[in-house]
Amino acid sequence: MAQRERNREERGREERDSEFVDKLVHINRVAKVVKGGRRFGFAALIVVGDQKGRVGFGHGKAREVPEAIRKATEAAKRDMIFVPLRSGRTLHHDVEGRHGAGKVLLRAAPAGKGIIAGGPMRAVFETLGVQDVVAKSLGSSNPYNMVRATFDALKHQMHPKDIAAQRGIKYSTLQARRHDVVGSEE
């Protein structure tokens, strides 16, 4: 009886979680040295998102790969952030992020450009729901640092309405200035 209830709860949890897309970024075999020798385990880095502007990453360690992935997925769902997207497909402005020796540059891109980004950053953008972006990784190519640097950059992403409110100007004035600058560059 208890088993049936647990299965029903798990099925309900899976249906709720089906809104999220998860990507395995990196899996690593780790060793714990003990008196009798080495104990091997696995560490997983997962990125989870709803493809509508919410994304999170998690790290999990366990003796078996599936358990490490499950732990990482749970951690990613706990620590999700919201990123405002322009037209639901790209970033509002160019931004830079850092973590440790990792540095990333993210640039908004015109429609049809696609996701031009390397490994770990691509997984973040695909789960976030970004369709057009150009990203460059500088410094460390460690997947953990790259993901954290990408999240640092995304946390600094602001909607133009928030920028206008901070500056004490109207949103329409900010948009007009943007179109003047963009128009003069072309």
Swiss-Prot record:
Disulphide bonds in the chain: none
GO molecular function: rRNA binding; structural constituent of ribosome
One Pfam short name: Ribosomal_S5
A biological process term (GO) from this entry: translation
SUPFAM superfamilies: dsRNA-binding domain-like, Ribosomal protein S5 domain 2-like
Record has RNA-binding as a keyword: yes
Database matches in InterPro entries: Ribosomal_Su5_D2-typ_SF, Ribosomal_uS5, Ribosomal_uS5_bac-type, Ribosomal_uS5_C, Ribosomal_uS5_N, Ribosomal_uS5_N_CS, Ribsml_uS5_D2-typ_fold_subgr
Top-level taxon of origin: Bacteria
Keywords: Ribonucleoprotein, Ribosomal protein, RNA-binding, rRNA-binding
Residues covered by the S5 DRBM domain: 20-83
One cellular component term from this protein's GO annotations in UniProt: small ribosomal subunit
Signal peptide: none
Subunit note: Part of the 30S ribosomal subunit. Contacts proteins S4 and S8.
Cross-referenced HAMAP family: Ribosomal_uS5_B
PANTHER family in the cross-refs: MITOCHONDRIAL RIBOSOMAL PROTEIN S5
Function in brief: With S4 and S12 plays an important role in translational accuracy. Located at the back of the 30S subunit body where it stabilizes the conformation of the head with respect to the body.
Domain writeup: The N-terminal domain interacts with the head of the 30S subunit; the C-terminal domain interacts with the body and contacts protein S4. The interaction surface between S4 and S5 is involved in control of translational fidelity.
Family note: Belongs to the universal ribosomal protein uS5 family.
Name of the featured protein: Small ribosomal subunit protein uS5
Organism encoding this protein: Brucella ovis (strain ATCC 25840 / 63/290 / NCTC 10512)
